[in-house]
């Protein structure tokens, strides 16, 4: 793959030539091939146009789901275990980047809440379901989507339950553990798939209740399935799961998002930065091992309750591809979001929110309010 070094140089040429990308641009996507190690971006200066440090708030501990963001710094970043941060130069762009872990480091609050509580944060991980729900109270705009399908799942012990659908889970009355504020749970309840009296928002990411009780629990197809079957000593047996995507909640998971004013105030920054994000994602997916190893090291340096393994991280990347969770998006390039798909979700999701008495969404919200493909480079492709 062309490295970030090459990608940044090509980007600089493209910007000089005035080749701006929009979500209606038609071009033949180019497949790139990964280098053996992460290379630093070269040829694009972000000095004076992007915040320095450029801070990204993620939604959880460092893991392959966030690898493309950590990969912008590379493997030589510095860990602050107390604050859950990873900091280093954003290649040769002239600025520093900091990636912040979520979960306990932000009080288990959604990244959108932290985004608006801390003005230092420039970008945050926000799924489009949450962005729709909070489009009035905490508005954000997605500029890059790593996921084509959300890896979010509900999982259970097949020795305790036999479920083929979300209706089955609801009919069983089984307790369902989830993180408070998760938009998908509002959807499942609002659509009548689960009942409000069977769900429990006290989940903190730990395995204890799943191991000791017969519960259904949220997780990621790219993480918890492998962890429970292979790494958690108290379990190490099969789990079954269903993708939330298959319930009709077809969100773009964990999109890299900015506040609406950044589309104008930081437009020059986004025009230069977002293609580097695309290239970082392609680089990671084509050669995941260096960053998978580093992510495992970071988790161990954080020394918290969350665990990881290189086997888990390598399996995660395989699941991303095998289950079609990560792929090129609209028009055949990475990061693009389909506005028709988002609008279709809005048409289903907003009435559910209204029925639940949730009033945080913008009246008349549409895809253009919460997402844009304007900053993407259509020549940067995974090739699958």
What are these regions (language model features)?
Residues 1-8:
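Bacterial N-terminal signal peptides that target proteins for export
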Residues 77-93, 243-249, 264, 325-339:
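Short, solvent-exposed loop/beta-turn-alpha elements that line the ligand-binding surface or hinge
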Residues 14-19:
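C-terminal motif of bacterial Sec signal peptides marking the signal peptidase cleavage site
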Residues 339-384:
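Conserved C-terminal helix/tail region of periplasmic/extracytoplasmic solute-binding proteins
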Residues 40-202, 208, 215-218, 242:
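Short, glycine-/small- and polar/acidic-enriched structural segments
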Residues 21-29:
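Bacterial lipoprotein signal-peptidase II cleavage site
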Residues 266-355:
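Secondary-structure end/capping motifs
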Residues 129-130, 204-208, 212-303:
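Pocket-lining segment of extracytoplasmic ligand-binding domains
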């Amino acid at each position: 793959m062309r490295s970030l070094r090459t990608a940044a140089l090509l980007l600089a040429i493209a910007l000089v030539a005035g080749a701006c990308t929009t979500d209606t641009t038609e071009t033949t996507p180019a497949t790139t091939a990964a280098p053996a190690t992460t290379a630093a971006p070269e040829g694009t200066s972000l000095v004076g146009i992007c915040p320095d440090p450029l801070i990204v708030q993620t939604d959880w501990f460092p893991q392959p789901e966030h690898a493309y963001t950590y990969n912008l710094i590379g493997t030589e970043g510095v860990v602050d275990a107390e604050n859950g941060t990873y900091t280093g130069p954003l290649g040769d762009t002239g600025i520093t980047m900091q990636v912040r872990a979520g979960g306990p480091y932000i009080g288990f609050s959604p990244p959108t809440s932290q985004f608006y509580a801390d003005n230092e944060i420039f970008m945050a991980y926000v799924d489009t379901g949450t962005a729709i729900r909070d489009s009035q109270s905490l508005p954000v705009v997605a500029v890059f989507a790593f996921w084509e399908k959300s890896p979010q799942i509900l999982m259970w012990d097949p020795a305790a339950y036999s479920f083929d659908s979300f209706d089955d889970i609801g009919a069983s009355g089984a307790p369902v553990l989830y993180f408070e504020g998760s938009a998908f749970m509002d959807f499942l309840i609002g659509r009548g798939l689960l009942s409000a009296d069977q769900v429990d928002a006290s989940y903190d990411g730990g395995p204890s209740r799943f191991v000791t009780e017969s519960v259904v629990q949220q997780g990621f197809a790219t993480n918890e399935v492998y962890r429970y079957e292979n790494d958690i000593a108290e379990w190490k047996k099969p789990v079954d799961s269903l993708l939330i995507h298959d319930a009709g909640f077809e969100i773009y998971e964990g999109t890299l998002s900015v506040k609406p004013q950044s589309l104008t105030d930081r437009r020059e920054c986004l025009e230069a930065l977002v293609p580097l994000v695309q290239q970082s994602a392609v680089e990671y997916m084509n050669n995941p091992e260096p960053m998978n190893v580093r992510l495992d090291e970071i988790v161990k340096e954080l020394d918290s309750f969350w665990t990881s393994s290189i086997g888990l991280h390598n399996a995660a990347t395989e699941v991303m591809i095998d289950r079609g969770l990560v792929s090129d998006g609209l028009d055949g390039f990475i990061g693009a979001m389909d506005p028709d798909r988002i609008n279709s979700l809005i048409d289903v999701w907003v009435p559910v929110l209204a029925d639940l008495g949730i009033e945080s969404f913008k009246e008349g919200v549409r895809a253009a309010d919460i997402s844009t493909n304007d900053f993407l480079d259509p020549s940067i492709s995974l090739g699958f």
